């Protein structure tokens, strides 16, 4: 069974970061080792929250403990998401290097959390710079949203063709695979939720219905998306098949959440539909 070291935020109530990705990844059939960058009472789109950012050296200490019991070599991928401080970033890169030193076949999947296309940047100073300068070159897979794609590539993206070009700019700097988690205003249609999966040689586009939650959009969708893609790829699915499953699985979670009238993602209620979606969305190869 595959093992994923997932370094992300954690909320006690609700679903964001590891709290959004950990259960779905396990439900898909992999082991997850959650390592939390922050621990908050709830996600930060509520009016208030409590909690703290973990000390940066805490991340390294935990991984060192795993290494000392000779289990780090069984880690197949490191997944990083929300980073609570720029200092944590340096420790995460060191962790990736430690894992790859004992398992050269391990992947680093970077979810470069900077913000939401409609909300602007939500991370502390220094994190965006770390992601561009340090995380991008060592990542094997990276999964930006539209704003993050523009920041990482230093290109304005207004359509799908430009998004593919920007993603290939990232491939030239490090990762083999780029998932654009949400094309937003750069997509073909504003009433659809569109994603791209891009390599140096090929690209695929997938579109699904946009589930309208009004002004109160659920948080953690990107974390769920990244986790599901990583699991699919670790299990040996093709890029196209993996993208199609992610689109359908996330749609099932969104529809279930909408049907139940909830704000928090209903990942437990939707678990069976997530693993075996009722809907199918075909990924179209662009080149």
UniProtKB/Swiss-Prot annotation:
What EC number(s) does this enzyme carry? Answer: 2.7.1.35
One GO location term (cellular component): cytosol
Catalytic activity entry: pyridoxal + ATP = pyridoxal 5'-phosphate + ADP + H(+)
Example of a GO biological process term: pyridoxal 5'-phosphate salvage
Q: Does the keyword Magnesium apply?
A: yes
| Function summary | Pyridoxal kinase involved in the salvage pathway of pyridoxal 5'-phosphate (PLP). Catalyzes the phosphorylation of pyridoxal to PLP.
Q: Which family does it belong to?
A: Belongs to the pyridoxine kinase family. PdxY subfamily.
Question: Which species is this UniProt entry from?
Answer: Photorhabdus laumondii subsp. laumondii (strain DSM 15139 / CIP 105565 / TT01) (Photorhabdus luminescens subsp. laumondii)
Annotated metabolic or biological route of this protein: Cofactor metabolism; pyridoxal 5'-phosphate salvage; pyridoxal 5'-phosphate from pyridoxal: step 1/1
**Binding site residues for ATP:** 111, 143, 148, 181, 208-211
Going by the UniProt record, its keywords in alphabetical order are: ATP-binding, Kinase, Magnesium, Nucleotide-binding, Transferase
Q: A Pfam family matched by this chain, by name?
A: Phos_pyr_kin
List required co-factors.
Answer: Mg(2+)
- SUPFAM superfamilies, per this entry? Ribokinase-like
Binding partners and assembly:
Homodimer.
Q: TM segments? A: none
Q: Which gene encodes it?
A: pdxY
Name the InterPro entries for this protein.
PM/HMP-P_kinase-1, PyrdxlKinase, Pyridoxal_kinase_PdxY, Ribokinase-like
> What is the protein named?
Pyridoxal kinase PdxY
